[in-house]
Every structure is written in C-alpha cells, then in structure tokens.
Design a protein with these regions (language model features):
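Conserved HGGG/HGGXW glycine-rich cap/lid loop of the alpha/beta-hydrolase fold
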Residues: 1-3
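Active-site-proximal cap/loop segments of hydrolase catalytic domains
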Residues: 5-16, 23-146
Length: 146
C-alpha cells in the first residue's frame, strides 16, 4: 500500500502478471516532510484511509479498470490498512490480503515492547483506562471491532 522495492511485495512482478498497481503516497510515508510523515499518528483510520480510497475512486473511473475485480494488499501498517478498509470500503474491493497488520489495536498496544512508539502513534496511554467495550479510542480504530 505504498511505493517501495520489496521481495515480498514486488509491484513490478504483479504488474507483469496483468495487475494494475495503485500505490498512493498516503499520509505517514517518508519523503514529504515531518508534518506529512506524522499525520497518521493518532489518526490511523483517518486521512490516510481517505488517501487510499480517493486513489481507488480516481483509478476506478478509467475504462480499463474492472471495478468488479479490485483487491487490497498490504503489510505492517499496510496490513492494518487492509483490515481497516475491509470494514469501511463501501463495496469497492472484492479481495483482501493482509500480512502482519494490526487487527486489534488494544491487543497490539498491550503486547508491544516499544511502548514509546504506541504512546506516540496512538496519542495516549490506555493502561488504566476503561476496558475495550466498543467505544474507547483504540476500539474505534480496531478493525476487529468493525
């Protein structure tokens, strides 16, 4: 769900097999300044997801795109994005492939060894907060509660 070279997600190989690849430069990717990079912190299901959906909506207008065969693939934050989009895509996609993405934000928060990162990215510490009941901040972001 972003532009980079990788052996596990090689866009050139996918394109060589007749797939149309859309890899938007969504909020949170490096190379566009710190403000752009940090716009996903505290907003995992927000503007960056709108970036993905607007890219899909734009390419879907092209006559060579079969909108009945759109898929979504990603790893890490891209994996979270795939899970999140599966619950919010308004029937845009027909298939989803997620690799090592966060499915339950509360669980990920409690199992990570990098608490500074979770506190920064989620915007606050949930320890001591009310347990997840579908209304807390992390539950609102979690694909598992959609």
């Amino acid at each position: 769900m972003s532009q980079f070279w990788s052996y596990r997600w090689n866009f050139q190989i996918m394109a060589a097999n007749d797939y149309i690849i859309i890899a938007p430069n969504r909020r949170g990717l490096p190379g566009f300044g710190m403000e752009w990079l940090e716009q996903i912190s505290g907003d995992y299901g927000g503007q960056c997801m709108k970036d993905y959906l607007s890219a899909i909506d734009d390419i879907s207008k092209e006559p060579y795109v079969d909108t009945n065969r759109l898929g979504c693939v990603g790893a890490s934050f891209g994996g979270f994005s795939v899970y999140w989009l599966a619950g919010h895509h308004d029937k845009r996609f027909k298939a989803f492939i997620a690799h090592d993405g966060i499915f339950n934000m509360e669980q990920q928060y409690l199992e990570t060894e990098e608490m500074w990162f979770a506190n920064w990215d989620y915007g606050w510490c949930i320890l001591g907060q009310k347990q997840c009941n579908g209304t807390t901040y992390l539950c609102q972001l979690s694909p598992s509660f959609r």
